[in-house]
């Protein structure tokens, strides 16, 4: 009977001629197919390719008539079998195990792929598929997606499959233990007594290496750790020198609990600190308040305020010290006046460079009596000619950079005679070596501007400008210089008027 055929019915040459669920009845479509194929012409069967895996799954499920598929036959394998492989299941086996007729149409969102020839041979070696199935188009599904599907929609099937997995894991551990015990029984050869000390040394050496590596890893990589219970990052405590017990022993009266109670601890004052205390008469005035750093952009008003504050503090300190000394009927010693004047001078010196430091650095760039560099065989970097002739064919002396070997004619550099005379009074720099006079840095060339009188370079942010000004700009160094008339005629006119 067809009902008793079992799984062997799936291998019959005509598996789709009869329905195993209704062995005694046939559909009109089957009658028509029998009438058309009554021996005159054999029926044509299309060979299924790799794209017809879902149809083969549907056909096999129909042929089996939702017969029971044991969970032991649902195989999970790894492909590729190396470390980079992932775990997969065959869609045909999953559909038979879950009893789904059209698995691909019911779950189209699952990631699936066709098996390659090498993968089929690998499964054939593992006895997962038969030789007949190697010629069919098989589809692989990701095992994690299949497990999630079974948990959500087929909990009973998943529980049955979990039991099988646990039994397989238990059997694997048992087999591994048996192999290990057999290896121990085979390797029961006795160790020579003379080699035992050598083996002990090797074992101790290996243990020492492991301990050293572990300690080094703890010190370098795992010094701090995050405590999950307190949400605190634990960091090892630093190393401290421990004093001997005699030095840290607590006395009988360490500290006074109420005012006037005896205690053995007392503060030790230095001689300089005692001079400020009014034991009989204070030798020193109260110490001055610490100065706060003033911003450079405050201007001259801060200088005036600082000067007035210093004057007030000075007068106040003098009056305090004089009043205290007069009340006791003593004259201030010479050492007090000297120390007071010394502190006041040091304070003034400390306050002065804070305000005038940049200005002094600018003025220090112009060296009195400076002699420019002399290069005998110098060549202009623009016209490539010497001092004998410039680009106009006239003899003209060259100016030289103080930092490098570059030289040039003033006419080639579009410099006036006044600018050339000013350049020769300080170490002039060419465009490639130009640095800011205030900060001394060559960076931020887009913010660098040059004085029209001396050709010194300045950063806009070093002189307090937001952008490079348009038109003529003169630096602070040239503004402080005495004005010199430029034209001979105007100088003569002024002399006549005078």
UniProtKB/Swiss-Prot annotation:
Its main location: nucleus. Residues 1-10, 285-296 have a biased composition (Low complexity). Keywords: Acetylation, Isopeptide bond, Metal-binding, Neurogenesis, Nucleus, Phosphoprotein, Repeat, Transcription, Transcription regulation, Ubl conjugation, Zinc, Zinc-finger. It is found in: Nucleus. The modification Phosphoserine is found at residues 12, 36, 50, 270, 297, 301, 327, 331. One of its GO terms (biological process) is positive regulation of double-strand break repair. One of its GO terms (molecular function) is zinc ion binding. It comes from the Eukaryota. One of its GO terms (cellular component) is RSC-type complex. CDD domains: PHD1_PHF10, PHD2_PHF10, WH_NTD_PHF10. The modification N-acetylalanine is found at residue 2. Residues 89-185, 292-334 are annotated as: Essential to induce neural progenitor proliferation. Belongs to the SAYP family. Involved in transcription activity regulation by chromatin remodeling. Belongs to the neural progenitors-specific chromatin remodeling complex (npBAF complex) and is required for the proliferation of neural progenitors. During neural development a switch from a stem/progenitor to a post-mitotic chromatin remodeling mechanism occurs as neurons exit the cell cycle and become committed to their adult state. The transition from proliferating neural stem/progenitor cells to post-mitotic neurons requires a switch in subunit composition of the npBAF and nBAF complexes. Component of neural progenitors-specific chromatin remodeling complex (npBAF complex) composed of at least, ARID1A/BAF250A or ARID1B/BAF250B, SMARCD1/BAF60A, SMARCD3/BAF60C, SMARCA2/BRM/BAF190B, SMARCA4/BRG1/BAF190A, SMARCB1/BAF47, SMARCC1/BAF155, SMARCE1/BAF57, SMARCC2/BAF170, PHF10/BAF45A, ACTL6A/BAF53A and actin. Interacts with ACTL6A/BAF53A, SMARCA2/BRM/BAF190B, SMARCA4/BRG1/BAF190A and PBRM1/BAF180. This is PHD finger protein 10. It comes from Homo sapiens.
């Amino acid at each position: 009977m067809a009902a008793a055929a079992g799984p062997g019915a799936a291998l019959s040459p005509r598996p789709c001629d009869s329905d195993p669920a209704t062995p005694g009845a046939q559909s009109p479509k089957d009658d028509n197919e029998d009438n058309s194929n009554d021996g005159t012409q054999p029926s044509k069967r299309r060979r299924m390719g790799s794209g017809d895996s879902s149809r083969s799954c549907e056909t096999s499920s129909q042929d089996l008539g939702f017969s029971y598929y044991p969970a032991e036959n649902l195989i999970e394998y790894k492909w590729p079998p190396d470390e980079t492989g992932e775990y997969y299941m065959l869609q045909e086996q999953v559909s038979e195990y879950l009893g789904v007729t059209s698995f691909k149409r019911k779950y189209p969102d699952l990631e699936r792929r066709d098996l390659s020839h090498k993968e089929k041979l690998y499964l054939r070696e593992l006895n997962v598929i038969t030789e007949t199935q190697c010629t069919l188009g098989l589809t692989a599904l990701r095992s994690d997606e299949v497990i999630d599907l079974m948990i959500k929609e087929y909990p009973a099937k998943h529980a049955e499959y979990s039991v099988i997995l646990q039994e397989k894991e238990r059997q694997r551990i048992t087999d591994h233990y048996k192999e290990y015990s057999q290896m121990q029984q085979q390797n029961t050869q006795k160790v020579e007594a003379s080699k035992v000390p050598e083996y002990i040394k090797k074992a101790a050496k290996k243990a020492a290496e492991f301990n050293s590596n572990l300690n080094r890893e703890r010190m370098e990589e795992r010094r701090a750790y995050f405590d999950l219970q307190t949400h605190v990052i634990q960091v090892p405590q630093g190393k401290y020198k421990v004093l001997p017990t005699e030095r840290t022993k607590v006395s009988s009266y360490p500290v006074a609990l109420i005012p006037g109670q005896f205690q053995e601890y007392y503060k030790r004052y230095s001689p300089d600190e005692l001079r400020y205390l009014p034991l009989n008469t204070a030798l020193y005035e109260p110490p001055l308040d610490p100065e706060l750093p003033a911003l450079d952009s405050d201007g001259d008003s801060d200088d005036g305020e600082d000067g007035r504050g210093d004057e007030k503090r000075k007068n106040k300190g003098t009056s305090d010290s004089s009043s205290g000394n007069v009340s006791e009927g003593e004259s201030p010693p010479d050492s007090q006046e000297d120390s007071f004047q010394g502190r006041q001078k040091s304070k003034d010196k400390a306050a002065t460079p804070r305000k005038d430091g940049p200005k002094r650095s600018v003025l220090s760039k112009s060296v009195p009596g400076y002699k420019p560099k002399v290069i005998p065989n110098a060549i202009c970097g623009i016209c490539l000619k010497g001092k004998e002739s410039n680009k106009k064919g006239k003899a003209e002396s060259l100016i030289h950079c103080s930092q490098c070997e570059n030289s040039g004619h003033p006419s080639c550099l579009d410099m006036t005679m006044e600018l050339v005379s000013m350049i020769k009074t300080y170490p002039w720099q060419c465009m490639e070596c130009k640095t800011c006079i205030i900060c001394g840095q060559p960076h931020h060339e887009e913010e660098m501007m040059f004085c029209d009188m001396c050709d010194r370079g300045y950063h806009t942010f070093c002189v307090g400008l937001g952008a490079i000004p348009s038109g003529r700009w003169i630096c602070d160094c040239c503004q402080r210089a005495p004005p010199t008339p430029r034209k001979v005629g105007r100088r003569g006119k002024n002399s006549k008027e005078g």
